[in-house]
């Protein structure tokens, strides 16, 4: 299957004759421009003569792929070609367990409260005109292209509302992308429309030419063969899998017939001592609900087999073209997922490990094989890390994340964070759900059994802390209960026991203060020492206003 019209007599290497760029064409920069790029941006590059040897970067992004429930199990080739050839992170998190806010954080290196991207709608700033004007010029791909001279290639799902007529339609190509093959709106496998450098192309339901994961694989291989060889490249390939509707390729539709959703300790149990949205789930789940989520779990794994094929093809092509040894490859997901945990059928959005923890595998120059890192990283670190690879200083950006390139290269005596912020603004319907008339307005994502996965006051913020002594999660809800959840994940990895009422009050106060600090952080202040870091300083007076009242928690309809 080929998406690009390639000349039969075209050599297999060379400039992009038929790959037309999404923004104005990106020829190799003249020597003076290259010098300006080096001096003004990517200072890590040691001279124009070495520009062709700057590292390439590939970012592979899955959609809704969990880590906690075994989401990497189907990806045997991916684990062998990336994880075993480099580093696997066992503590990788997202700052918001929902597609658009998480993807916006990846692109910008910022927490949701600094983006005001709060959900998957235009009103929630997902690919809105405001996002396009304020944030897109400052994404790390835009910096790679404008300041570092990288060719930039995108293929797949961008943001959930991309292509909306009220926000430029499919003609909008975000600043910073040389080659643009973006899916209109949310993940599909057939019957979708792509923006090919700003021009719409419809696809049907013929597997050989339309199955989206394979389409993305083929157009990516074409880019590798027909790009310019005079400049480094960055590729972002964003697959639909394993997002619903979970349509597997024909050859994989009978795979994993004996696989079921994991029956771990928090499967199909009541969420005791948790906030009301979790407590409202019906326990035990009905047989029909369990059959549904088992089927969904199986189909999710089936769709990932095509992603595994994509990764294999990509790595083999990089090797064939002589570029593999000079290319960093990242594999991750935008959020986790749950299937029956605390009797919630299927979704993401919640604060628990299964929704906020994601796979992260990296290989590349200077990374030793077969490594596992326990260092606490987040998807806001991807942009800073990739810019660091390109030689661009994080200090020139307003990003909240940190570069973990030193971790990848085995730096010793490294000063690193001990906590990250997780924040989410709940969504609800203004009217009663017609399928569940007994429920009040304000809930959403409801299933036929009238179990709802979201609500207006499912709005929370958490500090996820990992240090030598502590493995904690502290969360506060913006609801009438003023609910707090705290978990010691060393003793309670499945988050069964909320210890908010039994934990040391002094520690609780420190965590509350740290949460407020992180919710108001921006740029460098997001990287200050956490509660358990040696450099941390706690002044309880800062928790009180001049009037002596306890400082209020920082929630608003825009998450700050």
From Swiss-Prot:
One of its GO terms (molecular function) is glycosaminoglycan binding. Keywords: Calcium, Glycoprotein, Hydrolase, Lysosome, Metal-binding, Phosphoprotein, Signal. The active site is at 99 (nucleophile). Its EC number is 3.1.6.14. Binds 1 Ca(2+) ion per subunit. Residues 1-25 are annotated as: Disordered. GO terms for biological process: glycosaminoglycan metabolic process. One of its GO terms (cellular component) is lysosome. The modification 3-oxoalanine (Cys) is found at residue 99. This is N-acetylglucosamine-6-sulfatase. It comes from Bos taurus. The gene is GNS.
